[in-house]
């Protein structure tokens, strides 16, 4: 079981990469080096199915464009007593075949059969742009 989430405030894959690289050091003290942490309000009820084998699929500009492996899920309580879930993510951002996705609130579960496939290592910028255009037209 995977997760899918809107990447709010980010307009491209490259911007997400930059954001991740700039903020990785924020979490060193809590979770170690080379991780990215996304804090969300709700702990997944299906966490046992996800840790170490799932990814979070990022929706940017109305399309799923990449995924990031989930290493683990950790409970967090802020100083005011509110409970959260820290999603500890591997540093890798893996491009996927662009797949259209309408806006939604929060995160959602994503079945493995519904997840877009990863792009091959030999994909180039032209094929990415073409795939994005075809996805916008609903053809892939």
Report residues per predicted region.
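Long, hydrophobic N-terminal alpha-helical segment
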Residues: 1-37
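Short, well-structured alpha-helical interface segments that form or flank functional binding sites
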Residues: 11, 52, 129
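Generic secondary-structure boundary/loop-capping signal
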Residues: 3-5, 39-40, 61, 67, ...
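Short, well-structured hydrophobic secondary-structure segments
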Residues: 24-66
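Well-ordered alpha/beta subsegment
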Residues: 106-140
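A generic structural signal for short beta-strands and their flanking turns/coil linkers
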Residues: 2, 52, 83-85
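Short, intrinsically disordered, mixed-charge
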Residues: 21, 25, 75, 136-139
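Aromatic- and Lys/Arg-enriched surface recognition patch
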Residues: 67-116
């Amino acid at each position: 079981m995977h997760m899918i989430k809107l990447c709010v405030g980010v307009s491209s894959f490259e911007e997400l990469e930059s954001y991740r690289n700039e903020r990785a050091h924020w979490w060193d003290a809590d979770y170690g080096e080379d991780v990215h942490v996304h804090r969300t309000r709700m702990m997944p009820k299906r966490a046992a199915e996800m840790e170490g084998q799932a990814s979070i699929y990022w929706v940017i500009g109305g399309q799923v464009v990449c995924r990031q492996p989930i290493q683990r899920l950790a409970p967090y309580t802020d100083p005011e007593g509110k409970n959260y879930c820290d999603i500890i993510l591997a540093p890798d951002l893996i491009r996927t075949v662009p797949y259209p996705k309408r806006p939604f609130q929060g995160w959602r579960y994503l079945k493995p059969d519904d997840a877009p496939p990863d792009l091959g290592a030999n994909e180039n910028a032209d094929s990415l742009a073409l795939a994005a255009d075809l996805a916008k037209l609903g053809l892939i």
